Swiss-Prot record:
Residues 85-99, 302-313 have a biased composition (Basic and acidic residues). GO terms for cellular component: 90S preribosome; nucleolus. The keyword Transferase does not apply. GO terms for biological process: maturation of SSU-rRNA from tricistronic rRNA transcript (SSU-rRNA, 5.8S rRNA, LSU-rRNA). Residues 1-157, 287-313 are annotated as: Disordered. It comes from Candida glabrata (strain ATCC 2001 / BCRC 20586 / JCM 3761 / NBRC 0622 / NRRL Y-65 / CBS 138) (Yeast). The gene is RRP36. This is rRNA biogenesis protein RRP36. Belongs to the RRP36 family. Residues 13-25, 39-49, 100-121 have a biased composition (Acidic residues). It is found in: Nucleus, Nucleolus.
Amino acid sequence: MSYYFKNIKPSYDDDSDEVSDEQDLDAILASKMRGRAESDDESSEEEDDGLSKLSFGSLKKAEDQLEEEERGELRKKRKPQHSKPINDEPEVRHKVYKEEEQEESDSESGSDDGAFFEEDERDNHSRPKNKNSKKRKHAPTEHSSKKRVSKIRDIPGLEIARQAKSGIYQDVRFTKATGEATDFSVIRRRYKFLDEYREKEIEEMERLLNDKKFVNKAESREIENMKEKVRSMKSRLQSVKNRELEQQIVKDYEGKLNEGNKNRFHLKKAEKRKVIQKWKFDHMKAKQREKVMERKRKKKLGKEFKQFEFHNR
């Protein structure tokens, strides 16, 4: 009850009581207006003190309610995003766990923080895999899409020689595409008749080079090319013959060793080299032997001098 109704007293004189009641009411209203004007200044301080009067339990309930609302908003935002396979998102899951821990620890974080973490999560989804990650053993080979695919492709096991790539003709009889490589001795036996043609060609070119009329008419560059060709053909023919001779020497030596043996014995590469050198040295002339011995002596001295220079340093 207000102050006015508390001070009302019962009386029998109605007219006089009405006048006095009106005066009292006016006085009370005036005092109330003055009190309100004075209390406006203190209203802000009283509002601040209102929160301090609340209990800790009510504050905790309000805080939990706000957190539940924030989590619900985040779940609604994450629903449209398509989840990736389990193997591809270990980093994303770790990031989500960190977000939830941070939301629980920070009670005053708003919806802006949730949006920030959501953007970070999207960046993790769009981030490419590490290039240095170990590839599977049986994974298909990867080629850059920026590089144009060549019309002639390399087949593993059938590597094309550089000469064939440059457009120079290659004999199909000696390519790997026809099967395994044939033994050199078999090839040599089949195409030994070509040596006669090579020797005739060398003789014909030497005859032209010795002809003065041809030399005067031909250009100097053409003559030099012919001389170079003659030298290369001679060296190739001689190397083929030397190789054939070495194989024959080893074959004869192994034949003598394996006479009367059930199991054939084959020499190693180092032993073959020694047998060939011994045969050549035995079948040399006296002057050739002296030259070979002198060459070996100089070679040995050079090695010794190098060793002395190394120790003097």
